[in-house]
Amino acid sequence: MSDPTTDDVRRYIADGLACEHLAVEGDGRHFFATIVSPAFEGQPRVRRHQQVYAALGDRMREQIHALSMKTLTPAEWAAESQRSQHHHH
């Protein structure tokens, strides 16, 4: 079985989790996902990650160690987007 592409990983996550924003970057060996989902509201980071792993199911079992992620609620994402827009030095 060939390694998943960033598009594959993105699709896997989107299939199992309602995301408001989902971006996956990677080089085929390592993946970094930014996942914004209302499902994360009130959840600690560990639970958020568990939800993402559950969404992936067996599809990423081999590569799961290669996936790092940032899990945000829509409110956290909005706050972060606003902050990054105000970085004028």
Residue ranges and their predicted role:
Residues M1-E20:
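N-proximal, solvent-exposed amphipathic alpha-helical segments enriched in charged/polar residues
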Residues T34-R47:
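A short interface-forming secondary-structure element
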